[in-house]
From Swiss-Prot:
PROSITE patterns reported for this sequence: MRAY_1, MRAY_2
UniProt-annotated location(s): Cell inner membrane
Organism: Cytophaga hutchinsonii (strain ATCC 33406 / DSM 1761 / CIP 103989 / NBRC 15051 / NCIMB 9469 / D465)
Disulphide-bridged cysteine pairs: none
Reaction(s) catalysed (UniProt annotation): UDP-N-acetyl-alpha-D-muramoyl-L-alanyl-gamma-D-glutamyl-meso-2,6-diaminopimeloyl-D-alanyl-D-alanine + di-trans,octa-cis-undecaprenyl phosphate = di-trans,octa-cis-undecaprenyl diphospho-N-acetyl-alpha-D-muramoyl-L-alanyl-D-glutamyl-meso-2,6-diaminopimeloyl-D-alanyl-D-alanine + UMP
Protein name: Phospho-N-acetylmuramoyl-pentapeptide-transferase
Keyword Chloroplast part of the UniProt annotation: no
Membrane topology annotation: Multi-pass membrane protein
Native organism taxonomy: Bacteria, Pseudomonadati, Bacteroidota, Cytophagia, Cytophagales
Gene Ontology CC annotations of this record: plasma membrane
GO molecular function terms noted in the UniProt entry: metal ion binding; phospho-N-acetylmuramoyl-pentapeptide-transferase activity; UDP-N-acetylmuramoyl-L-alanyl-D-glutamyl-meso-2,6-diaminopimelyl-D-alanyl-D-alanine:undecaprenyl-phosphate transferase activity
Major site of localization recorded for this protein: membrane
Family annotation (InterPro entries): Glycosyl_transferase_4, PNAcMuramoyl-5peptid_Trfase, PNAcMuramoyl-5peptid_Trfase_CS
Length: 403
């Protein structure tokens, strides 16, 4: 919104300083600042409003240290996160950019699914929340929208350079280029690190690229959003981890959306993707601002309203910058938490069937509860998980050069 206003003032009145809004770095910095400001100024008021509506967390006694003290803590704090994402993005991003539109839709879409889940838990006194099938339907529907848009929208392109022998390359090696719609993505750590989903689909059957790609998008969005949801089990873990991931994806978006940096790093140039930095900055600011109130001891929980939205937009952002195959590393905390639940449940069922009694791999799942049961304090678990998250982020950024 402000981008267009200041562009108009610059063109119409030659307003001094208006041109600064042309710079992605400035708008990203302002988006992060405003996002943090909204959280710090309005956060307490939002928490008070939630408390007045008696929207408190109901706690099931799992025998964890300090667990029952959290009973009644306001939940649905994800509304604060969503507000802190949407307002700065609308103010500072180009609202005609297809990637920004997709991410705003994803934020609201998954936020609504999470809100309905929290609403049923709190007001209908149903601990199961929204039925799993409805969550899946919502995530699959969003996956269809995102997948088809990324595949067929004319603004979603990569730059292909024409070499002297007539061959094509995404690495800048000539001054002759065309921006083309493509299903290319990148594979981390490989020298020739480009993968065309179209070439995989040809091994299965002809003309099945759209089906394969959309299916992948659905899986990625569902897996990452559910991973963030499972990770949100102790104070500050999901918010802090998401902030680290948001910063990393913003860096990927910046270098991929800048022709000079893309050429220097020998990576795929993705026109229009630089605008994702503004959204990523707002996302990071929202997570850090939320941490002000969610760090131990938490004054508010994000609930599914926040966790599903966070995981979903992280997935969509990674798909937009064609780094979805890097997500197992970048979102390693989400992955480990998810796997710990799958392993625990599967092993319990297997041993119960084979030996007549269920056995466990971990003292409790997800993994953060295992460490709680082992006597570690919440703050220590969260801090160490953040450190691992930072290491994974650095490893992910290293793929820009290590291949």
């Amino acid at each position: 919104m402000l981008y267009y206003l200041f562009e108009y003032w610059e063109n119409k009145y030659d307003l001094l300083g208006a041109g600064v809004f042309q710079y992605i770095s400035f708008r990203a910095g302002m988006a992060a600042f405003v996002s943090l400001l909204i959280a710090l100024v309005f956060g307490k008021k939002i928490i008070t409003f939630i408390q007045n509506k008696q929207i408190g967390e109901s706690i099931r006694d799992l025998g964890l240290a300090g667990q029952m003290e959290k009973k009644g803590t306001p939940t649905m704090g994800g509304l604060m996160i969503i507000l802190c994402i949407i307002v700065p993005t609308v103010l500072f991003a180009k609202l005609t950019n297809v990637y920004i539109v997709l991410l705003l839709i994803s934020t609201i879409w998954l936020g609504f699914i999470g809100f309905m889940d929290d609403y049923i838990k709190v007001f209908k006194k149903n601990k199961e929340g929204l039925q799993g099938k409805f969550k899946i339907i919502g995530q699959v529907s969003l996956g269809l929208i995102v997948g088809l848009t990324l595949l067929y929208n004319s603004s979603v392109v990569i730059r292909e350079y024409t070499l002297a022998d007539g061959s094509k390359s995404t690495i800048q090696s000539s001054s002759v280029y065309t921006d083309v719609e493509s299903s290319l993505t990148t594979i981390p750590f490989l020298k020739n690190n480009e993968l065309d989903y179209g070439s995989i689909s040809c091994l299965i059957t002809d003309n099945c690229t759209p089906i394969l790609y959309v299916l992948l998008v659905i899986i990625v969005i569902t897996a990452v959003s559910n991973g963030a949801n499972i990770t949100d089990g102790i104070d500050g873990l999901a918010a802090g981890t998401s902030a680290i991931i948001a910063l990393t994806l913003s860096i990927f978006a910046y270098v991929s959306g800048n022709a000079i940096f893309a050429s220097y790093l020998n990576i795929m140039y993705i026109p229009n993707s630089g605008e994702l930095v503004i959204f990523g900055a707002a996302l990071m600011g929202a997570c850090i601002g939320f941490l002000w109130f969610n760090s131990y001891p938490a004054q508010v929980f994000m609930g599914d309203t926040g966790s599903l939205a966070l995981g979903g937009v992280i997935a969509v952002m990674a798909l937009a910058v064609r780094k979805e195959l890097l997500l197992p590393a970048l979102c390693g905390i989400f992955l480990i938490e998810n796997l710990s639940v799958i392993m625990q449940v599967s092993y319990f069922k297997y041993t119960k069937k084979k030996y007549g009694e269920g056995r466990r791999i971990f003292k409790m799942s997800p993994l953060h509860h295992h460490y709680q049961k082992s006597g570690f304090h919440e703050s220590k678990i969260v801090t160490r998980f953040w450190i691992v998250g930072i290491l994974l982020a650095i490893l992910s950024l290293a793929t820009l050069k290590l291949r």
